[in-house]
């Protein structure tokens, strides 16, 4: 039994429409973030998880990277830093590896969310902020604490959402 998925579905017109809807959902949900620039909380992870669940690691990563660039072009008053695009793509790729074509379980959801929070949110985003001039010593602990607090919350919300999607998926 393969634990992680490395496949993506065929890119059909229907799949492109679904992907575009999830990308729009991610942009809208991303606008509801709050916190400081280096410590944000946002519900946009719902769309990222659904991209990974439906489209696998490769298409989800590409869509997340494209979506990050679209968000920057539409909303960002500042300069673009490609590190955040890499983080978004890696998060979507990890969700795709854990969820695409796999049965949703609490353990799988906990591992997926934990890996994304550790790799993308704590390690990479802190690195990108440090490269941009924010001292990592001042942000690593608040970012780590925030992500530890978010782990059970995001896991529960993700699991509930994916189980609901799993029930309605045959009817789509």
Swiss-Prot record:
It is found in: Cell membrane. It is a multi-pass membrane protein. Keywords: Cell membrane, Folate-binding, Membrane, Transmembrane, Transmembrane helix, Transport. The chain crosses the membrane at residues 19-39, 44-64, 81-101, 109-129. Its main location: membrane. GO terms for molecular function: folic acid binding; transmembrane transporter activity. It comes from the Bacteria. Disulfide bonds: none annotated. GO terms for cellular component: plasma membrane. Folate-binding protein that interacts with the energy-coupling factor (ECF) ABC-transporter complex. Unlike classic ABC transporters this ECF transporter provides the energy necessary to transport a number of different substrates. The substrates themselves are bound by transmembrane, not extracytoplasmic soluble proteins. Binds folic acid with a dissociation constant of 9 nM; binds polyglutamyl folates less well. Upon coexpression with its energy-coupling factor (ECF) ABC-transporter complex EcfA1A2T in Lactococcus lactis subsp. In Lactococcus lactis subsp. cremoris (strain NZ9000) forms a stable energy-coupling factor (ECF) transporter complex composed of a membrane-embedded substrate-binding protein (S component), two ATP-binding proteins (A components) and a transmembrane protein (T component). This is Folate transporter FolT. It comes from Lacticaseibacillus paracasei (strain ATCC 334 / BCRC 17002 / CCUG 31169 / CIP 107868 / KCTC 3260 / NRRL B-441).
